[in-house]
UniProtKB/Swiss-Prot annotation:
One of its GO terms (biological process) is DNA recombination. This is Integration host factor subunit alpha. This protein is one of the two subunits of integration host factor, a specific DNA-binding protein that functions in genetic recombination as well as in transcriptional and translational control. Pfam families: Bac_DNA_binding (PF00216). It comes from the Bacteria. InterPro entries: Hist_DNA-bd, Histone-like_DNA-bd_CS, IHF-like_DNA-bd_dom_sf, IHF_alpha. Keywords: DNA recombination, DNA-binding, Transcription, Transcription regulation, Translation regulation. The keyword Calcium does not apply. SMART domains: BHL (SM00411). It comes from Haemophilus influenzae (strain PittGG). PROSITE patterns: HISTONE_LIKE (PS00045).
Amino acid sequence: MATITKLDIIEYLSDKYHLSKQDTKNVVENFLEEIRLSLEFGQDVKLSGFGNFELRDKSSRPGRNPKTGDVVPVSARRVVTFKPGQKLRARVEKTK
């Protein structure tokens, strides 16, 4: 299974909509930057028909060093999670 990259998306959109690669790159970069900024400022991002990027706070917990087996503290942190929407889930399930 192949991986799609940001460059693949830019090239596809540029060809499909007959836009310059530079203009398309700017649109894609700005779109992703808005998502990054929203998450950075503590806002969840909801993309209708696609899914939600949500922030979750994880509390500190004891972890384990896999090499030595020693218990090490894992500090509290904030993580980004993605929850696919119903439409995306349904389409992905059809492709199995």
